From Swiss-Prot:
GO terms for cellular component: cytosol. Gene3D superfamilies: Translational regulator CsrA (2.60.40.4380). Keywords: Activator, Cytoplasm, Repressor, RNA-binding, Translation regulation. A key translational regulator that binds mRNA to regulate translation initiation and/or mRNA stability. Mediates global changes in gene expression, shifting from rapid growth to stress survival by linking envelope stress, the stringent response and the catabolite repression systems. Usually binds in the 5'-UTR; binding at or near the Shine-Dalgarno sequence prevents ribosome-binding, repressing translation, binding elsewhere in the 5'-UTR can activate translation and/or stabilize the mRNA. Its function is antagonized by small RNA(s). This is Translational regulator CsrA. One of its GO terms (biological process) is positive regulation of translational initiation. The lineage of its organism: Bacteria, Pseudomonadati, Pseudomonadota, Gammaproteobacteria, Aeromonadales.
Amino acid sequence: MLILTRRVGETLMIGDEVTVTVLGVKGNQVRIGVNAPKDVSVHREEIYMRIQSEKDNENGPQSY
């Protein structure tokens, strides 16, 4: 895992098209903004895991 330090208002780049900007810090919460192309999905981890779980349920158990 790459660990970076950023201050409010500073941005980091992921590839050529995705930016992540620190918008604010209050207590133990950090607000970030993500700029990404429309074809790149951006989700909080818990939402992503729910989506993956729902996909697995739609496919049903696999028999071999």
